[in-house]
Regions:
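Beta-sheet repeat architectures centered on beta-propellers
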Residues: 26-183
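Surface-exposed extracellular loop regions of Gram-negative outer-membrane beta-barrel proteins
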Residues: 1-26
Length: 183
C-alpha cells in the first residue's frame, strides 16, 4: 500500500521490465500521518482525518463509537505525531495521538478487530513495537524510558474503563473486586 494525502495505491511486484505495477485502490481517502497505518493478518488499518479505515481487498470505514470523542479532542497542528501500533496478543490496533490541549502524544484509542470494540485512555508514548523481537510489546515515551506492556501487577487501584460497540458506549468509572466468604 502506498498512501498519499488523497489516495491509496497498491504496488505489486510484476517482474521485468517494469518490476512493480502500481494501481489505484481508492481516491478521496485521507491518512492522518505517515505513521498512522499498520498491517496485520492481511489487513491494513489506518486513522484518516476524521474516520478509521481498513483495507482487506477493498477500503472500508470502520464503524467507531468513539469517533467524535477522538476527533473533537485532537491537536491538528501536531497531527504528524500520530502513530499506530499492533498488540497482536489481544487483536488490537492502537492509535496514539495528541489531544487538543497537548503538543505531545498523550491519548490513545484502541480497536479490537476480532471483537469489533473500541477503548480509549491517556498515555504518553512516542513509539510502539509489538511482541516478536521481544516477548512483550515495548514502547517509548518522552521521559526517555522504554516500557514493557502486558506485564506486571496492577498498581493497587483501577482506572476508568470504557468500551464501545457499534452505537453503544459503556463507561464503568471503577471496578471493585470483591470476595464472598461463606462458612
Amino acid at each position: 500500500m502506498v498512501f498519499t494525502d488523497t489516495s491509496i495505491y497498491s504496488m505489486q511486484f510484476v517482474g521485468p521490465p517494469d518490476t512493480f505495477g502500481i494501481t489505484i485502490v481508492s481516491e478521496g481517502i485521507s491518512i492522518r500521518s505517515p505513521n498512522s497505518a499498520v498491517a496485520i493478518e492481511d489487513n491494513v488499518f489506518w486513522m484518516g482525518n476524521n474516520e478509521f479505515y481498513v483495507y482487506n481487498g477493498a477500503v472500508q470505514k470502520i464503524p467507531c463509537t468513539l469517533r467524535d470523542f477522538v476527533f473533537s479532542d485532537f491537536n491538528n497542528l501536531q497531527a504528524e505525531k500520530v502513530f499506530a501500533g499492533v498488540n497482536s496478543s489481544f487483536s488490537e490496533i492502537w492509535w496514539f495521538y495528541p489531544s487538543a490541549d497537548s503538543n505531545e502524544v498523550d491519548k490513545y484509542v484502541i480497536y479490537n478487530y476480532q471483537q469489533q470494540i473500541w477503548y480509549y485512555g491517556s498515555l504518553n508514548r512516542t513509539a510502539w513495537l509489538d511482541r516478536g523481537v521481544n516477548e512483550l510489546p515495548i514502547s517509548a515515551s518522552t521521559d526517555f524510558y522504554l516500557y514493557n506492556h502486558e506485564t506486571g501487577d496492577d498498581d493497587g487501584s483501577t482506572n476508568p474503563v470504557s468500551a464501545g460497540r457499534n452505537c453503544h458506549i459503556l463507561l464503568i468509572p471503577y471496578l471493585l473486586p470483591y470476595a464472598v466468604i461463606s462458612s
